[in-house]
Amino acid sequence: MALKGYVANIEKLTEKNTDFRHVLYTGKHSQLVLMTLKAGEEIGMEVHDHVDQFFRFESGEGEVYIDGAKHKVKDGDCAIVPAGAQHNVVNTGKKELKLYTIYSPPEHVDKTVRHTKKDAEKMPEEYDGKPTE
């Protein structure tokens, strides 16, 4: 069976996204996820012991914390958090902070959608080993 992969205009999808977390595609070794943080909202301080994480910011303003170091971010910026680093993303602006993130390896169950941070906290999920294809 031929694998299809995933091809899309990620900027448009990220800008249209209103969900706190929306898993688009899960491969064997990486996962593409859209995120939107409301004004003043944050992902929450966390550590992924075995997962590297890439962030790309499409709109809004915020701060990324990586092992205690604070970095301001805006449209066009990116950040990479190495596995084992304590990190957080905070929306410091008055508008939504829109971003996509790539986990390597995957972190969430494929096709997971959590409309709000509260939903994500109530229904945490860990990757079950099943990729999109």
List PLM regions with ranges.
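Glycine- and acidic-residue-biased ligand/ion/polar-headgroup-sensing regions
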Residues: 51-62
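A short, N-terminal "cap"/entry segment at the start of jelly-roll beta-barrel domains
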Residues: 1-29, 115-133
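Ligand-binding loop in jelly-roll beta-barrel domains
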Residues: 83-109
